[in-house]
Regions:
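Non-heme Fe(II)/2-oxoglutarate
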Residues: 1-64
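PAPS-dependent sulfotransferase catalytic domain
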Residues: 33, 159-160
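Catalytic core of non-heme Fe(II) oxygenases with the double-stranded beta-helix
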Residues: 58-151, 155-157, 163-164, 168-172
Length: 172
């Protein structure tokens, strides 16, 4: 997958909606043979809606990856859909922070309650890029320190963020 990503970065135009991150759609059929056994063991039999190869160059603030189900599946709306992260490479320390709060809105909104959660200094350091408004609407962060080869999965409705990796010298 690293070779594929390197080739895409060198030769293909990234998705405009995800710039400045380098993000490329990949047909699941091209990677199904390698990914299907991993996904099946992690989630059970599942349908893959989207595959992206990405090089993230700015920290992601608090958001979720929820997209409403379409008519192309036999799943009922509300059935869990998972985001699965397969870290390929980073040039330094990286974390994904997952919160228990869920929403069908892409980021915390006025409709989401203020939690009153008191973040530790370590959590605050990891999330210096997240606006206070969003921080007030999430709680109890699960911090996942990852490296190449890991597999991390969470419900797409859960709010999550990257750490502020630039603060500790990681550029992607």
């Amino acid at each position: 997958f690293n070779k594929i990503l390197d080739n895409f970065i060198a030769n293909k135009k990234p998705r405009e909606e995800n710039l400045p991150h380098l993000s490329y759609s990949v047909s699941y059929a091209h990677v199904e043979k390698k990914l299907s056994p991993i996904l099946d063991s992690l989630l059970g039999s599942c349908e893959v809606a989207e595959v992206l190869l990405q090089r993230v160059v700015q920290p992601h603030s608090i958001h979720n990856d929820y997209r409403p189900p379409t008519n192309t599946t036999d799943r009922e709306p509300g059935e869990p859909h998972y985001a699965v992260l397969f870290p390929l490479r980073a040039d330094g320390l990286s974390h994904t922070i997952i919160f228990p709060e869920q929403s069908v809105n892409a980021s915390p909104s006025e409709d989401d309650p203020v939690t009153g959660y008191e973040f530790t200094d370590e959590h605050k350091k990891l999330l210096t890029h997240a606006p206070d408004y969003s921080m007030h609407r999430v709680s109890d962060p699960q911090v996942v320190k990852w490296s190449a080869g890991d597999v991390i999965a969470w419900d797409r409705k859960n709010f999550h963020a990257s750490d502020n990796f630039i603060e500790h010298g990681t550029s992607y």
